[in-house]
């Protein structure tokens, strides 16, 4: 009961703060939203991607078995964000440009069984930091708040490493490019400090690329058996999430 009461009090307080931000209270002097800004914050992102690996078994040069290992992964990541941009504002609208860089280190490991020979391949996929550049346009809700829409270009860096049955590995790096769009809200605490909160969805695509790792064994009858593992880079990655930064505004 005590926990429920505290939660209710907290929710009520947040509602009061939100109401005060958009209406009521004393008049707030007009804030100059024009200028260059730079800020730091955090982002909570959800990564979704598809990837395919293949294990092939051959004897005497002929394929005996080829097994596909498709993977659909969904991973969340919390990481630091840097932001900079420039805003133009009138009495009732805002427009501008914004760039964000988020450091992420999304990792996933998948096992690929090699039938008939009892050995395994595995591959590790890493999706690293991503960079976005967007145009934005919106309206002022009041003297200290504005809502806007944004859209632009984004890129994310990745790396896939394929491990064989022995202490051998091969890797490939790739960069995925795509578009990003979202909605945001800015609250100005004072003339030079504001909170920038946004939700965005980004879709990335990349050219198909792959790496292969092969090994050979011999059966009891002396027949040579070859085993190879192949993995493709993620060709399609979707990222959606929330970003919050605190920025300092230079009215220049």
From Swiss-Prot:
Q: What is the effect of changing residue 125 to I?
A: In strain: Xinqiao
Q: Name one Pfam family in it.
A: OMP_b-brl
- Topology of the protein relative to the lipid bilayer: Multi-pass membrane protein
Any single biological process term in GO: monoatomic ion transport
Record bears the keyword Metal-binding: no
Cleavable signal peptide: 1-23
Q: Keywords for this entry?
A: Cell outer membrane, Ion transport, Membrane, Pharmaceutical, Porin, Signal, Transmembrane, Transmembrane beta strand, Transport
Q: Mind telling me which GO cellular component terms the entry cites?
A: cell outer membrane; pore complex
Where is the protein situated, by its record's location annotation? Cell outer membrane
Query: Where primarily located?
Result: membrane
Effect ascribed to mutating residue 172 to I: In strain: Xinqiao
Disulfide partners:
none
Q: What terms describe the molecular function in GO for this protein?
A: porin activity
Instruction: Give the record's biotechnology entry.
Output: Might be used for vaccine production.
> What outcome follows a substitution of residue 115 to S?
In strain: Scurry
Designated name of the protein: Outer membrane protein P1
Give the organism the record lists.
Answer: Coxiella burnetii (strain RSA 493 / Nine Mile phase I)
